[in-house]
Regions:
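Positively charged, low-complexity intrinsically disordered regions
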Residues: 4-5, 28, 363
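Low-complexity, intrinsically disordered short peptide segments enriched in small/polar/basic residues
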Residues: 4-6, 16, 264, 440
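Cationic-aromatic interfacial patches
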Residues: 22-135, 139-140
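Residue-level signal for mature regions of secreted extracellular proteins and peptides
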Residues: 14-15, 411
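Small/flexible residues
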Residues: 5-6, 60, 422
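C-terminal motif of bacterial Sec signal peptides marking the signal peptidase cleavage site
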Residues: 18-20
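Well-ordered beta-sheet/strand-loop patches within structured domains
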Residues: 22-25, 38, 111, 131-138, ...
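Bacterial N-terminal signal peptides that target proteins for export
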Residues: 1-11
């Protein structure tokens, strides 16, 4: 199965689908350590503190605030969003009335900017974007910074304190420069381009790749598809999540022809999501990048484990959330959500009587006197032999799967909303490190025993389900992924509506 094409259609609205995966109890890729210390807020008033009154700004403080608002566009904000055309004139007006208006406007803009840097522009949150920014009293914080003469330090603390955010900001400047210079050429459609080909399309391919990545050092005067160009195409395919064939097939061509301005908007959307993250991350954590279909484990900020994952389909979207894995279930049965049972399994039984029994399904009683469909644990169970539970309102979790076919594909968004893992027992071994009872051999013995067991973790592991369609690799280069849920488009639309 090849990767589906879902090249960004910016500003469109995505229909949200309910996420349902069920549990047996009935209940950034990231590429390097996140900043888990941050700059801190030593001058921030505690939530219960008395409101700090405003006081006049000194001229040097005014200059710092104006400079910050003027460069807000470098953080992905709209041009002039916090810097209206009359701002500077009113701030420096000789007339006392206009000057007072300018001072009030300046305060309004810097407070609005501070809230925006904390991800608070959006108010109409989709149901399955459960990772939301923390409340933030920007006005009181600003007044305190003025009072303590720490305006510059306060401003420096406003953007997300993560290396990956800073790298996205650098990438934003670079891609904006590409747009300003005219973007990159479009490659005409036609037969698959592969080694040995020649002609105008190959010449356009060379030019296209060099505009985005000058370090490839391609000869843009040549129209030959040689070994050097093959390596460059493979490099592009790795950066964009395609099979590294070195051939320009339909999906690779569609990706190459995405406009540079669309890449700018994609970066802007991902910078916005970083504003929703907790400012201090746990040093040990699991990150799932839904868009890239990858899971990464960090231990003490060091990359410890990574593997492919299979998140929900576009009609069964895996939600954005943060929680903690507190238990692991061995040989888990699957309580099938009623929506999935009615949509998928009851029709199969109607078409092929005996299907449910043949695949290990049965009906069980529920506490409210009803009945629900359950798939027994075992080799055929959709949850495989192990699942990782964490509290959340969507009844989703990480789990094993009896079918590993998807892990060999580029497009792995195939689940009902939960996240399937390529090597779940490797993760279990990591989570039980230091536990003298649940050794790898003990886990395998328990699985072979066939009984369902829930094991509480001595140290719950934070887990972040995130959606990065642009993220830096270990060398700081940008990787792009398809907007499989149209969430970039939806987010950009919500930002535009927040004006």
């Amino acid at each position: 199965m090849t990767r589906r094409s879902n090249i960004a259609v910016w500003m469109s609205a995505a229909a949200l689908a309910a996420v349902a995966c069920g549990t047996s109890a009935g209940q950034p890729n990231s590429t390097g350590p996140a900043n888990t210390t941050g700059p801190g807020y030593p001058y921030t008033a505690p939530p219960q503190a008395q409101a700090v009154p405003s006081q006049p700004l000194r001229r040097d403080q005014v200059s710092v605030v104006l400079a910050t608002l003027k460069e807000a566009e470098t953080h992905g904000f709209r041009a002039g969003e916090f810097y209206p055309a009359n701002l500077e004139a009113e701030v420096y007006a000789a007339d006392p009335t206009f000057h007072a208006q300018g001072d009030a406007l300046l305060r309004t803009m810097i407070i609005r900017y501070a809230r925006a840097q904390h991800g608070l522009r959006i108010t109409n949150w989709p149901k399955n974007w459960a990772m939301k920014p923390a409340p933030y009293d920007a006005e009181n914080d600003f007044n305190l910074a003025v009072q303590q003469d720490r305006v510059a330090q306060w401003i420096d603390s406003l953007p997300p304190p993560f290396d990956r955010y800073r790298l996205l900001r650098t990438a934003l400047a670079r891609y904006k420069a590409i747009v300003a210079a005219g973007g990159w050429p479009t490659i005409d459609g036609g037969p698959e381009l592969k080694p040995g080909a020649a002609g105008p399309r190959v010449a356009a391919l060379r030019q296209r790749l060099m505009v985005e990545e000058p370090t490839l050092n391609l000869d843009t005067t040549s129209d030959q598809f040689d070994d050097t160009l093959t390596d460059a195409v493979k490099y592009y395919q790795r950066r964009n999540g395609f099979d590294t064939t070195g051939k320009v097939d339909t999906l690779t061509l569609e990706s190459l022809n995405v406009a540079a301005q669309s890449r700018v908007l994609q970066i802007v959307a991902n910078m916005e999501r970083w504003r929703w993250e907790p400012r201090l991350w746990p040093a040990s954590r699991i990150e799932v990048n839904i868009a890239a279909a990858e899971m990464t484990l960090f231990e003490e900020n060091a990359l410890s484990l990574e593997m492919r994952a299979a998140p929900g389909r576009p009609d069964d979207q895996t939600p954005l959330l943060t929680s903690q894995i507190d238990s692991i279930v061995l040989n888990p049965p699957w309580n099938v959500p009623s929506t999935i049972a009615e949509k998928e399994y009851y029709p199969k039984e109607a078409a092929h009587p005996g299907y449910l029994a043949a695949h290990g399904f049965r009906f069980i009683d529920t506490p409210d006197g009803g009945r629900r469909l359950q798939q027994k644990s075992g080799a055929k169970s959709a949850l495989g032999q192990i699942k990782f539970d964490f509290p959340n309102p969507f009844a989703v979790y990480l789990h094993d799967t009896p079918s590993h076919k998807a892990f060999g594909q580029d497009a792995r968004d195939v689940s009902h909303g939960c996240v399937r893992l390529e090597r779940p027992f490797d993760l279990a071994d990591k989570l039980f490190t230091g536990d003298e009872t649940w050794t790898p051999d003990r886990i395998q013995d328990a699985v072979q025993d066939g009984k369902t067991q829930r094991v509480q973790l001595e140290r719950p592991m934070p887990v972040f389900l995130m959606y990065w369609t642009v993220y830096p690799d270990v060398k700081g280069r940008m990787d792009f992924r398809n907007d499989i849920y149209d969430w970039d488009s939806q987010l950009l639309g919500l930002i535009a509506a927040s004006r």
